[in-house]
Amino acid sequence: MDRSESAESAESRRRRAEESGQGQLFRFWDELSPAEKEALLEQLEMLEPRELREHCQRAREAYVRESSAPQRLDDRMQPVPPEFLGSVRHSGTGELERWEREGFHQIAQNKVAVLLLAGGQGTRLGVTYPKGMYSVGLPSAKTLYQIQAERIRRLQQLASERHGETCTVPWYIMTSEFTLGPTRKFFEDHAYFGLERSDVVMFEQRMLPAVGFDGAAILEDKAKLAMAPDGNGGLYRALSDNRILEDMEGRGIQYVHVYCVDNILVKMADPVFIGFCVSKGADCGAKVVEKGYPAEPVGVVCRVDGVYQVVEYSEISPETAEKRNPNGALTFTAGNICNHFFTVPFLRAVIGSLEPRLNYHVAIKKVPYVDNEGNLVKPTSPNGIKMEKFVFDVFQFAKNFVAFEVLREEEFSPLKNADTADKDTPTTARRALLWQHYRWARRAGTHFLDETGSPIRDSHSISGEGDPPAVCEISPLVSYFGEGLESYMKDKDVSSFPFVLESSDAGPVPV
């Protein structure tokens, strides 16, 4: 093809792209090199003119709609009925052990997988790499990815010991254009943290253009649209795009535990949760925590017009948020923590015909852009719309939905913000894990001593804020959730800190 034919082809492709009504994307066209023109056209052609036009219109309309007073759902809401709500706190030991046995049975039969939602960057943390690569400052310096990988390894070991057969819990990791490359390299550099490489399956979710408040797609440089992952609800399209369910079905997987990367306390494929859901015959389930206070800005799992969904705190009036049962507990108290159970047939139904019914949600963000002079601008206030789907919006399709309440201090401490914020920071995540390990060690019979050899007294709150009385970290390879520590720690005197119990064959190691 000669240069004139190439130019004609580029111009005709440009005209087709302009059918999207987004002609402003070509305002630097004459300044672009042939390679830059090709890159811009390829990006636009992946979107299709009609889809881009509809996406920008939808974003603009959603922004206008959500900028108005939020729609209140109070009169349409009902709490999760007691018969569909399990609880760690309100269940007897026998019942919890029965669910745990069922969960371990399914894990030992190679029927359980975990699926990590890891498409987001650590922007709010102040880093440019994936959140899973972040270290919150533990004595061991382990990252979120390493902690989670080691929990899977320990869980496989526990299930195998119980049932006398080797088992595998495959780990599916949904990444994005931003996180796939760094995540894959990180795992390769760390030998997949001891997991079989074939049992760690990474796949990529779709990207959508960021849109300005005027409905125009945003350029992040002269030849590139600003793009963002399509939310954690992009999972369902990604499962289809990458044939992930086919992989699961080929392995005999029947149950999938889905969770977000940023919860340092997450129990991977929690046998109690899995067993509860399987025992109830659930096709879809959610772990929840009790709301800390009525106005806590957390979504609530409940029924709306008879179907299950997560209602955002902005959709509930203060009066409804403060409503209480006769026993004094909040009526709408099931706080969503993005920790879910799905059967593979349920996921198959979602990607088969139900996914298009999921609504998009508006996220108002600060989106870097090029101004009319071609200069890169990093805005100090929100200037753009990112459209997202939410993973939990499929609850409405469940035929048998259940919820399972767990203790916040044992299972939920998200990492979202830099340490300049008040909550959900590296410091709060680190403290949550160290407090948990301190409690485990004390229950196992460990004696923590100060520099004079005197016992360190527990603080007034053993679930507390601030640092624990003694800094103690327990490797997930030693204990998944506090089990089996007596042989290492019962009647042990520990006086050198920080203290790390690193592996089941190494014994206690002061750092």
From Swiss-Prot:
Short sequence motif named Substrate binding, residue ranges: 117-120, 312-313
Keywords of the record: Nucleotidyltransferase, Transferase
Extent of Basic and acidic residues compositional bias = 1-19
Please give the InterPro entries that the UniProt record associates with this protein. Nucleotide-diphossugar_trans (IPR029044), UDP-sugar_pyrophosphorylase (IPR039741), UDPGP_fam (IPR002618)
Q: What is its EC number?
A: 2.7.7.-
Region named Disordered: 1-22
- Family label: Belongs to the UDPGP type 1 family.
Q: Please name the PANTHER family in this protein's record.
A: UDP- GLUCOSE PYROPHOSPHORYLASE, UDP-N-ACETYLHEXOSAMINE PYROPHOSPHORYLASE-LIKE PROTEIN 1
Q: What is this protein called?
A: UDP-N-acetylhexosamine pyrophosphorylase-like protein 1
Tell me the name of the encoding gene: uap1l1
